[in-house]
Amino acid sequence: SFSVGVLTRAASDMGHAFPFGLSLLPNYSEFANLFDRYRLRRVDVRIAMVQKNNHTTSRFPTVWAYMDDDDASIPLTKNAVLERQSVRPFTFSDAKTVYSVSIQPRWLLDSTNKASLAPRDMWIDMSTPSVSHYGLKMWVDDYNSSYDSIISVDATIHFECQCVR
């Protein structure tokens, strides 16, 4: 489990993309010394509101999250996010401060060809731990509040290794 990032919102909305990979894990090289291959099975993502904006009349932020497994481009507009079929909204509140989602990220066999999605069960050589696995994109809508909200994004990567050295 590790922190993917902390988002501070102040008076603007913003898109985010989160590619995952073995190289993001602390001390991943320990596994590289022990095994020949790996594959990412699942990523559990926890999006939590650490600090709400402290103005009593301001609204809580809404996170619009969706699965996109062909690139790591950041969504540029809220409308582009809302056009996605699988988008899921989550509005934080005093009672709902955490949004959790589990994804199965994908990677491309050829990074220049978006049609080259690798099969989910395909093993990757340990010599390439920085292969990007695409999956989660989101838009944070802070309703143009002039007060800050802090949102943390944490991930737990579930992976398998094969062929002990």
Regions inferred by a protein language model and the residue ranges of each:
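Capsid-like jelly-roll
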Residues: 1-165
